[in-house]
């Protein structure tokens, strides 16, 4: 239990890497939650922490408004167009956290990335980071991943999540996220939390 608490705190308050990182991946969000990752991404660019903000190239599906609209919304939120880069994920019938993570790690390896920042909405950040680390350890273990949660939004606001099929307050979605972490770990889709914690302890 203590290990789980340490992992969660490390994910939510990760020590930022030195220098400028090659890129930060902004996980696909449903529209009510996307501003959270846009704010975090804009701050990373303004503080010169990353060169690129990566997004999924998918068309609208699974609650994601699609790359064209996502890019437009990012620019409207103050992010320079030139820093946005799409990660190939099509063709895919659906879009979910594991698909995003596997394709992003593949992209990072192809581009020669050594480091990558992972950004998602706060209630999804733990599962997003665990999934990305799982993909990296299985596909590209030398990749160093860092966690930067999205900006907080009202916890009691009712929103959609999980491919646009789940609805509840952001606070209620915390429990749903924990259920998914447990389920996908048992299935073998995610590495155990202790393995992720060991990765973070050894990363730097």
Report residues per predicted region.
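A conserved mid-domain beta-alpha-beta active-site/ligand-binding segment of alpha/beta enzyme cores
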Residues: 91, 162-165, 169-204
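A structural signal for short, hydrophobic/glycine-enriched beta-strand patches
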Residues: 1-161
């Amino acid at each position: 239990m203590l290990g789980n608490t340490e992992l969660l705190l490390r994910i939510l308050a990760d020590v930022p890497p030195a220098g400028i990182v090659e890129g930060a991946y902004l996980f696909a969000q449903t529209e009510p939650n996307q501003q959270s990752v846009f704010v975090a991404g804009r701050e990373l660019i303004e503080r010169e922490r990353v060169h690129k903000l990566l997004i999924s190239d998918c068309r609208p599906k699974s609650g994601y408004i699609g790359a064209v609209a996502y890019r437009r919304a990012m620019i409207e939120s103050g992010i320079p167009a030139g820093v946005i880069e799409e990660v190939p994920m099509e063709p895919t019938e659906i879009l979910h956290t594991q698909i995003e993570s596997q394709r992003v790690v593949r992209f990072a390896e192809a581009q020669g990335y050594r480091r990558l920042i992972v950004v998602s909405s706060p209630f999804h950040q733990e599962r997003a980071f665990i999934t990305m680390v799982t993909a990296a350890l299985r596909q590209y273990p030398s990749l160093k991943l860092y966690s930067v949660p999205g900006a907080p939004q009202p916890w009691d606001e009712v929103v959609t999540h999980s491919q646009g099929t789940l609805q509840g307050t952001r606070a209620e979605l915390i429990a749903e996220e924990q259920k998914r972490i447990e389920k996908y770990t048992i299935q073998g889709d995610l590495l155990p939390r202790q393995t992720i914690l060991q990765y973070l302890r050894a990363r730097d």
